[in-house]
Amino acid sequence: MNTFFRCLRSELIKLQRQPTLWVHLLVPLAGIVIFLGYYAYTPFTPASKVSAYLQVLAVSFPTIIGIVCAIAADQEAAAGNYQQLLTLPNRLIALAGKLTVLLLLGLGSTILASVGFGVGFLYLLSQSPYGLGFYLEAACLLVGSSLFLYALHLYVSLRFGKGASIGLGILESLVSALLLTGLGDYNWIYIPCAWAARFVSLWMQYGGANAVSLPIPADTLLEPGILACVTGTLAIMVLLGVWFRRWEGTKSLE
């Protein structure tokens, strides 16, 4: 356990030399300003504005995750060709430390994006139909359903490089947006990049502050969707650990 906390401390020190922290801070603030400015003059209902904002937030997740994982992996490559990760007696602790820091940054950034928007929507525009607790719950739901993507993009960044991770993230965001339409009604549970957007949409419509019974299609897919998300996340975490123990610090193109 002491080794794990030392790894966490080391990862936090590394943040001072890379733009990861600024990405997690400035991107949410920019999104809040843009959407609050836009919503100040649009005639849509307050509930639809919140729903659209959270969906855009969910759709942008894969791209942002791809970028921050690429930055983290690139920093390790520049600092001795991943030796800081590979030379520890227990590699998995080093991997867990890096992944934990990325997840904590993602959680903090998402809370800032969601709750910050809620504060502005509630107190500046006086339009929010929900309390701040709703936005905090939404942030936790978004991050929880995106754990799979963090593990996937960390693997892609280490194995194939930053270009592959960022490119995959952009593609996943496009697919996620597409699966918010009727095309994804019965297919989203099999596509990890669609989980966050679909879960937050279902929660907005039928849960949280609008607790009503789900229609048959949504009800029959919600439980399999949760099961797919949980099992898929656990599986990729295990596979990432197994691969990392055998990895020698080389990319596939080398």
Q: What feature does the model see in each segment?
A:
Residues M1-N2, A72-Q83, L149-A177:
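Cytoplasmic juxtamembrane interface segments
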Residues L21, G31-I64, C69-A70, L99-K162, ...:
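Secretory targeting signals
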Residues V27-G31, V101, G169-S176:
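Transmembrane alpha-helical core residues of multi-pass small-molecule transporters
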Residues I65-C69, A78, L149-H153, P192, ...:
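Hydrophobic/aromatic residues in alpha-helical transmembrane segments
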Residues A70-L104:
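Helix-loop-helix units of permease transmembrane domains in multi-pass membrane transporters
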Residues I166, E172-K251:
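Terminal transmembrane helical anchor/hairpin motif
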